[in-house]
């Protein structure tokens, strides 16, 4: 893997009210090549005006040197069509646990994905599934079991460092499990913090999204795994923090931290010393 072969994107969910031109300036100014856009109600692209609203936004982003690398959205026909029109390759979704329970979820999910494959073929746009804790397929191992029966040109994987970490699944195992279908690598981090106690004295835990260096996810191990596997796709900084104070600084700090880890991994793989250590 070479960092120059990576497309660096940022999920822009925290900035729903920023005009698209200002959003483009923000993302480009932080050193990213692309964005993941939340194609949902309440954001800069009007769903009622697709595909024209997506084309307008894409044009503004292109002028700033950016592209839309993926969208987080519901894969409806209008969304597929808009993505195809402006060259957005991936629609990211999660896979919920069925109302009938976990045992029923596999069949229900496969029927849903089967229904999406014709649109993937028609529009040339992939659907990427991201694991998510709680009421969804929660980790990469569960996801790999589903994806094994699908062509990665249609249904692909979005690896997520935080949600695998919350499920206590290490990157050295989860990334290879998804490798054949891997389209996007999400970096954010999280941990569990005590939120109080119940009347019976037992602890209550909550999820906290924190800095890349502070969570359960081992970003260094993830960097090593990506480098060893010569990954060359999209890496997305998810910009998700429970405390959004000084958010732009936090994203920039995590971006720099990840870049340093990848540089160290590349140097290790090449049998050399990271540039920062050579100049120290």
Where are these regions (language model features)?
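Active-site acidic/histidine proton-transfer and metal-coordination neighborhood
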Residues: 21-22, 29, 63, 67-157, ...
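C-terminal/domain-terminus segments
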Residues: 237-258
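Acidic/histidine-rich catalytic cores of soluble enzymes
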Residues: 118-216, 223, 266-272, 277
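Glycine/Thr-rich phosphate-binding loops of Rossmann-like dinucleotide-binding domains
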Residues: 45, 101, 195, 245
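N-terminal pre-domain/capping segments
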Residues: 1-90, 180, 255-280
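Charged helix-capping and loop-helix junction motifs
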Residues: 49-56, 105-114, 140-145, 169-176, ...
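Active-site beta-loop-alpha junctions enriched in small/polar residues
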Residues: 11-15, 38-42, 73-76, 96-98, ...
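Hydrophobic faces of well-ordered beta-strands that scaffold small-molecule active sites
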Residues: 6-12, 35-37, 68-73, 91-93, ...
């Amino acid at each position: 893997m070479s960092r120059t072969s990576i497309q660096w994107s940022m999920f822009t969910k925290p900035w729903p009210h920023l005009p698209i031109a200002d959003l483009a300036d923000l993302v480009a100014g932080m050193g990213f090549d692309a964005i993941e856009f939340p194609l949902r109600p309440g954001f800069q692209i009007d769903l009622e005006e697709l595909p024209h609203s997506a084309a307008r936004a894409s044009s503004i982003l292109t002028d700033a040197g950016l592209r839309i690398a993926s969208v987080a959205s519901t894969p409806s026909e209008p969304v597929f069509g808009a993505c195809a029109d402006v060259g957005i390759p991936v629609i990211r979704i999660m896979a919920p646990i069925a109302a009938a329970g976990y045992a029923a979820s596999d069949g229900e999910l496969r029927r849903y994905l089967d229904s999406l494959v014709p649109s993937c073929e028609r529009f040339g746009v992939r659907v990427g599934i991201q694991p998510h804790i709680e009421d969804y397929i929660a980790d990469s191992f569960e996801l790999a079991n589903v994806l094994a029966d699908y062509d990665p040109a249609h249904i692909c994987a979005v690896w997520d460092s935080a949600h695998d970490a919350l499920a206590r699944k290490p990157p050295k195992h989860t990334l290879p499990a998804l490798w054949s279908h891997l389209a996007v690598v999400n970096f954010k981090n999280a941990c569990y913090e005590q939120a109080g106690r119940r009347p019976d004295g037992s602890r209550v835990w909550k999820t906290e999204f924190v800095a890349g260096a502070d969570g359960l996810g081992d970003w260094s191990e993830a960097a090593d795994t990506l480098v060893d596997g010569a990954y060359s796709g999209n890496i997305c900084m998810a910009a998700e923090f429970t405390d959004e104070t000084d958010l732009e600084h936090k994203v920039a700090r995590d971006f720099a931290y990840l870049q340093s880890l990848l540089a160290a991994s590349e140097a290790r793989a090449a049998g050399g010393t990271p540039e920062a250590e050579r100049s120290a």
